[in-house]
């Protein structure tokens, strides 16, 4: 069983389904409203747990109704929460999500996520030392992201840095990560490059191995030499929220099988995740993933 530590955000997603996205100053009638668990850290933790990994999460929640619901939901999924702080003077993070035509628009209010600290990462030293991989994203303070990357590197544990939401990062951080997993837009921001530049060129310029996600087109990955391509899988898209988080989680869980196999399984898991509503609603288990891959091979 893979042991995964996730350092990241926990949100309550406030999801509105609509026939289309609204313009400035416009009001339309929505079709459905739901509250659903989310946040990149929590999503990746749940996705990894559903795929059979032993998962611990480092993060923070407010001492409020959303926080109680989110903590209970994560515990039900089997995620270890000893390193998730409960902050009495902060609200839990939220994400307001509009879903239309299988695409989404998202506004995140960090709340307690803005107070996830490097000290929490240090306190999880023993967990990280035993882990097969560490996942970290950028919905938490950057000094905490840095602490995670540096500790994982020092302990010889692979750190997968998912640079979302993206901003330019110091080269030495990127060099310490085992893999960085941006989309094309995020990669350009990371490198301070023109987003219209060919993504294969950008991948070769990166100071670290890159696994580049391309939505329905699949993913490109590079450790040395030319980037390699893993095709995407055709599915009926209901909601793309959480697809990237599912991809990253599967990549971490299956990394021990080799990068190429891990990327293929990550693309398949992400494809399955978009077939149902909600960031966590479509995340597959190992049997569903294996059956889907067998069907594709046939």
Where are these regions (language model features)?
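Aromatic/hydrophobic pocket-lining residues that form π-stacking "cages" and hydrophobic walls in ligand
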Residues: 44-45, 70, 148-150, 269
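Ribokinase/PfkB-type carbohydrate-kinase core domain
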Residues: 1-10, 71-86, 98-228, 294-297
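Gly/Ala-rich phosphate-binding loop of Rossmann-like dinucleotide-binding domains
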Residues: 49-50, 153, 256
